[in-house]
Structures are given as C-alpha cells and as structure tokens.
C-alpha cells in the first residue's frame, strides 16, 4: 500500500460528493439536459443526458421512486419494510417483482461476506440511533443485543425468502441500504432512451458516455480535496465513507465514541480501520447481476469492502476497487480506472 497526497478540488469546476463528477463545463456541453429528483432516497439524484427526457418518462421515473420508497424505505411509516417491523407475530410479505434481483444480490453478498452484509442489520442501526426519527441516541440495551453474535435475526434463517415473498415469525427491522440506492439508479437507467447519460446519486454513479467522464475521488477527511480522479465511459462507480453519516455518543462525562452507519452485521458494530472505499463495475461485466445491475453491485461492494476481505469478495464478484485506511494508506486493484495522488514511500 502507498500513502496518498491530497490535492484540492479546482473550486470552479468540481462537485463535492463522495464520487464527484469533475470537469462540469465539459459534461454540461456533452449532456446539457439535466433532470433532478432532489429528495429521492434522502440524498437526491441528478440525471444528465444528451437529449431531453420527455414528460412521460419523467413522470414514470417519479412514480418508480415513490413506489420504491413506499416498499423499501425504513424511514417511512407506511412502507412495506415498516409493516414487517410492526408485525407482532411476523407474516408473509409479498414484494413487487422488481425486487427479485435485489434479493438475489443480497443473497450473494450475505454468502460472499459470511454474513457481514445482512438486511437484518436494520435492528442494529436502530439500536445505535440511526432510526426513522434520526435520534442518533444509542439504546441502553444495545451492547447486549447488537449483531448476529448476540442473537439478532439473520437473513435466510429468521427471514426466509420464496421468490419475492419474505416470511418472518416476529417483528423484523430490515435495511436494504447497502445496495438499495444503486439498485434504484439501475432501474432508472433502464428507463432512459438517451444514448449518453450520467446518473449521480450522491456518490453512486452510472455512466454511459462516448468519451470518459472525469470523477473526483473525494478525500473523506476533507471534502474540498480529492485523492484521485477516475475516468469512466461506461460502467458504475460507487463510493462509501462514514464521514458522510456519523454521530458521537457519550460514554461518560469525558469520553465520546464515534458511531457511523457502516456496520458489520456479525457483531453489529461500526466497521473500523477503513475510511473510504470505491468499487467499479464495467458495463461489459460477465456476471449476470453485475451486467444487468452494475450500480447495485458496485454499491453493495463499496459497503462490503468495509467489513469483508477483498479476496473473499473476488471469489464471487468481478470488480476493481480502491480503499483508504485510517493511516492514510491506499490499496488499489489492477485496472481500477483512476489516477491516484500517491506520495513516494
């Protein structure tokens, strides 16, 4: 691994997101038509295309986003996920057909990470304060209940799946955030008729362009700096970092500990030692899930890189990546499509 050097974003031409699009003047010229869904999944989405999105397609996109959140959001009291969490004796819950590939991906991630990625981690997130009301207050009984190791429900054992039907026997707090945003990006991308487009969902990018788009890799310690620049023409690049979503919890009058949302589902605790990750899936990926839903897979892998061994993930998924650890050392795979600002060792 090599230490990195920080390079400032040119202030007039870079967006400051975890996977930020650089060279905005060039992008505006190549894809001048912009459609924004500012509230989608809490982060917003911006779609740049080379030809206008007609009103019918935009309306269909809005309907899809609404349906998606109504089914999968644990922050909505009227969602299907919320209903599963309220079912005192569990039940059989039928999801839309479009959920099947998402569940397939979670099956694959659960297996590839030996359970470190698990939708049942929603219960741990709630105990740590990342609940529907965003209380950021840890429950008193959290230490005794966090993670599968302490008896929390487990995907495939306590939640069984039959196609797009999930069966439970008690209230279950599920969270599909590890790759849910990327999956919505893929579904929206399928609705576009433009030959060139970029969907930017707060760090999750799906790019189809004739010439590469420059993407700044944001430094998690200083969002005004980049640690590298990726160049992507066709594929998905997703970033993950706790710096965007973290809170402090008081242990006593003098001590606070930092909590974030990237949990290892096995012990239910925030992942340590990694500060940021980037995962890239090319448009010509060979694995069916990656070829059909590249952003979802890249999104899930960017999270999995925090809690699982890279070699273990590569036995299931074909991807390239970069990770930045807490000592400012960066690891990068061969063929990762970025130039990184490295210092000499």
Spans of model-derived segments:
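Mature catalytic core of soluble alpha/beta enzymes
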Residues: 2-345
